Amino acid sequence: MNGKYYYGTGRRKSSVARVFMQKGSGQIIVNGKPVDEYFARETGRMVIRQPLALTENLESFDIKVNVVGGGETGQAGAIRHGITRALIDFDAALKSALSAAGYVTRDAREVERKKVGLRKARRAKQFSKR
């Protein structure tokens, strides 16, 4: 990436995304692949474009993303968080609109650990009276 770029780190579940944003034509590259090729589901692509659509910058920036860890949903959420932070780096005035939509706050929900003596995190073995 040549010239001025804007950076944002996004996290969601166990995914971490590093987002590099530069003035351009609206091309989004995730781990070397176009976003439409990387994310099979439409929901992932939609989630990624939300902050850009909100700020009316869908075709103003070329975005290059490196994302590691987690699954499809977690990675999409991490990229959205990173794009939001990069947009704030570009123009701090956008923060209020992005914050009102809930994109600035990191979603802190994580998988709850499995406990000893239970089948899952909270699911106990079936109880039989007789």
Swiss-Prot record:
**Domain of life according to the entry:** Bacteria
Which Pfam families does the entry link to? Ribosomal_S9
Which Gene Ontology molecular-function terms are recorded? RNA binding; structural constituent of ribosome
GO cellular component terms, A-Z: cytosolic small ribosomal subunit
Q: Which GO terms describe its biological process?
A: translation
Q: Which InterPro entries match?
A: Ribosomal_Su5_D2-typ_SF, Ribosomal_uS9, Ribosomal_uS9_bac/plastid, Ribosomal_uS9_CS, Ribsml_uS5_D2-typ_fold_subgr
**What's the family?**
Belongs to the universal ribosomal protein uS9 family.
Task: Give UniProt keywords alphabetically.
Answer: Ribonucleoprotein, Ribosomal protein
HAMAP family named in the record: Ribosomal_uS9_B
Give the species this sequence originates from. Answer: Chromobacterium violaceum (strain ATCC 12472 / DSM 30191 / JCM 1249 / CCUG 213 / NBRC 12614 / NCIMB 9131 / NCTC 9757 / MK)
Task: Provide the protein name.
Answer: Small ribosomal subunit protein uS9
